[in-house]
């Protein structure tokens, strides 16, 4: 897993070492941010169900001003902290351990220019 574009292009990110967390693929992130283009620059972003933090880190790499990561799994929160520190982005983000609905109840939606959600999905 790596950062696809922007100032951190090519930077490797740490991946989960446990089952159940499926990071957003590099290809999907590349497609998403190619569509968004320059609209990411100078924005405040919510990365909900943040998992590894890869989506929010990609936004920061491409010029987002600030990202709020929301994740309820404590292992994933630790992984986000590790990835953010590895990318030297701690001053440009906030990391909250909470379920997304609870976190949204405490943060005005107007606080964000862009909301990115990649919730977990069931597997059979």
Question: What feature does the model see in each segment?
Answer:
Residues 1-124:
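Class I S-adenosyl-L-methionine-dependent methyltransferase catalytic core
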